[in-house]
C-alpha cells in the first residue's frame, strides 16, 4: 500500500517542469486604442432619450425627427429597420411591465427574491 504511493510521489518529483510564459496577442496600448475607436464608431447611435421621444411622438413629428437625424448622422438614413422597431417594442414592454411588477409585490424584501424549485417566489429577508 505504501509502495504505490511512494512510487507516484517519486514520479511526480522526477517529471520535468517546464516554465511557460503567457503573452497577450496585442500590446495593451493597441487594445486601448482599439476600444477607443470602437466606442467612437458607436457615438452616433440613438440614446435612450431619443428612443423615448420617438416612441411618444406623433407620426408627423416622427418623420421630422427621422429626417433631422438623417441630416445630422448620414448613417441613420436607412435606420428605421427591424432593429429600431425591436428597440421600440422593448422600451414599450419595459414601461408596461413596471407597474405590473410593483402591484405583484416583486420588489419587497431586503435581499431580493428567491425562485423556489417548484416555481413559487419567496422573499429572502426582512
Swiss-Prot record:
Disulphide bridges, residue numbers: 110-126
PROSITE patterns on file: NATRIURETIC_PEPTIDE
Residues in the signal sequence: 1-22
One Gene Ontology term from the biological process aspect of the record: receptor guanylyl cyclase signaling pathway
SMART domains noted in UniProt: NAT_PEP
One GO CC term on file: extracellular region
GO molecular function, a single term: hormone activity
Domain of life, source organism: Eukaryota
Prosequence residues removed at maturation: 23-104
Pfam family name, one: ANP
Alphabetic keyword roster: Cleavage on pair of basic residues, Disulfide bond, Hormone, Secreted, Signal, Vasoactive
Cellular compartment(s): Secreted
The family this protein is said to belong to: Belongs to the natriuretic peptide family.
Function of the molecule: Exhibits natriuretic and vasodepressant activity. Has cGMP-stimulating activity. May help to regulate body fluid homeostasis in a variety of aquatic environments.
Record's protein name: C-type natriuretic peptide 1
Amino acid at each position: 500500500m505504501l509502495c504505490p504511493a511512494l512510487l507516484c510521489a517519486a514520479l511526480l518529483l522526477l517529471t520535468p517542469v517546464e516554465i511557460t510564459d503567457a503573452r497577450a496577442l496585442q500590446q495593451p496600448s493597441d487594445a486601448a486604442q482599439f476600444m477607443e475607436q470602437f466606442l467612437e464608431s458607436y457615438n452616433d447611435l440613438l440614446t435612450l432619450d431619443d428612443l423615448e421621444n420617438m416612441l411618444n411622438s406623433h407620426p408627423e413629428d416622427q418623420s421630422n425627427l427621422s429626417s433631422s437625424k438623417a441630416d445630422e448622422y448620414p448613417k441613420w438614413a436607412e435606420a428605421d429597420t427591424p432593429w429600431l422597431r425591436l428597440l421600440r417594442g422593448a422600451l414599450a414592454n419595459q414601461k408596461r411591465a413596471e407597474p405590473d411588477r410593483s402591484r405583484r409585490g416583486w420588489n419587497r424584501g431586503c435581499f431580493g427574491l428567491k425562485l423556489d424549485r417548484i416555481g413559487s417566489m419567496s422573499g429572502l429577508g426582512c
